[in-house]
Amino acid sequence: MSRQIISPLPGIFYRKPGPGKDPYINEGDTVSAGQTIGLVEIMKQFSEVRAEFDGVLEKFEVDDFGVVNPGDVIALTS
């Protein structure tokens, strides 16, 4: 059964900590509870999006630089 990682805020979702950097995590990677999987930017403020469970990141539901709203599913883990 998949578990959802939900956006806490509206804004732009980023999979990388900055231009030219590697993504925080890729699909198929193991993820730990509390691990950062991306950032949401709103008005030049960045908030980390963290996994709530240990597992494997199955799929990102939002593209890098995609618009998210509170409650949107960002990724699925198993």
Regions found by a protein language model. Give the residues of each.
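Short hydrophobic beta/alpha edge segments that flank linear recognition/processing sites
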Residues: 26-48, 69-78
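Generic structural signal for short, solvent-exposed loop/turn connectors between secondary structure elements
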Residues: 1-3, 64, 77-78
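Short beta-strand-turn/beta-hairpin segments enriched in glycine/proline and small hydrophobics
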Residues: 1-21, 39-52
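Short histidine-centered loop motifs in beta-beta connectors
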Residues: 15-26, 30, 53, 59-66
